[in-house]
């Protein structure tokens, strides 16, 4: 019996050694691939840039009662440079489509000379007057919809509400530049805008984009009271000498740098 037990122990030892030899060294499993970031247009952004704008100012002037026409109507053109800042939020959905909301402000030097000839019934003898129409700032709020045409390239259309500020106009005689005494106070005009553009990723700097946009703005109609001062040919101060009915349009082209705070999106595994 003792010999039988020793024989079993020897067989077990031999069998274990053989099995261990057959198994060989333990295999090595490669670590899973790192999570890769997928570009996403969803998130907050800020922007800043500059551009060039042109305006058209349509105006006509009558007496306060509207019974006398001082100026039947004419157009004034203007142009100038502008600076622009903005911020917004975009959301990418259904693959390559993007929607967003934004607000921006423009600080500009878009101006033109509003010159016209007023008949004798206006202010003394028939003669020419001129005054500078200047849009010195404006702001806009709106939305946009776009399509990611290529990796890192967004094309879009936008629209919304906009408001512009026109500085006070002080008219002078066109012949010698001396004050007429006729003026129109600073005022604001509001309307809508429509535009479109592109955003392109600057690959060397993650999150930085180059945006180019064109925009048309219609600031609507407005009627303003022109006052007269106690100088020039007015002679007597009058808060309401005449009515100026006007309409302002503007077209602008801008180029900006945009920074997106979460460009790259959330990490997504490349192995399933």
Question: What is the predicted role of each segment?
Answer:
Residues 2-272:
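Gram-negative outer-membrane beta-barrel domains
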């Amino acid at each position: 019996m003792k010999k039988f037990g020793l024989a079993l122990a020897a067989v077990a030892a031999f069998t274990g050694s053989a099995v261990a030899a057959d198994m060989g060294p333990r295999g090595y499993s490669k670590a899973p691939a790192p999570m890769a970031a997928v570009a996403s247009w969803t998130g907050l952004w800020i922007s800043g840039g500059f551009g060039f704008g042109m305006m058209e100012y349509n105006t006509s002037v009558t007496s306060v009662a509207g019974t006398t026409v001082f100026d039947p109507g004419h157009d004034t053109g203007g142009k100038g440079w502008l600076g622009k800042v903005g911020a917004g939020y975009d959301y990418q959905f259904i693959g390559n489509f993007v929607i967003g909301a934004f607000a921006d402000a423009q600080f500009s030097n878009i101006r033109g000379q509003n010159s016209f000839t007023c008949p004798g019934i206006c202010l003394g003898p028939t003669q020419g007057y001129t005054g500078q129409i200047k849009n010195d700032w404006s702001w806009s709020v709106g939305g946009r919809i776009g399509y990611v045409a290529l990796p890192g390239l967004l094309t879009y259309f936008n629209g919304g509400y906009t408001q512009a500020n026109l500085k006070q106009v002080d008219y002078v005689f066109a012949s010698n530049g001396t004050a007429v005494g006729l003026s129109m106070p600073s005022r604001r005009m509001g309307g809508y805008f429509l535009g479109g553009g592109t955003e392109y990723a600057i690959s060397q700097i993650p999150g930085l984009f180059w945006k180019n946009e064109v925009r048309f703005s219609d600031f609507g109609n407005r009627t303003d009271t022109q006052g007269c001062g106690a100088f020039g040919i007015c002679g007597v101060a009058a808060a309401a000498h005449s009515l100026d009915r006007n309409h302002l349009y503007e077209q602008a082209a801008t180029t900006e740098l945009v920074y997106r705070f979460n460009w790259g999106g959330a990490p997504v595994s490349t192995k399933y």
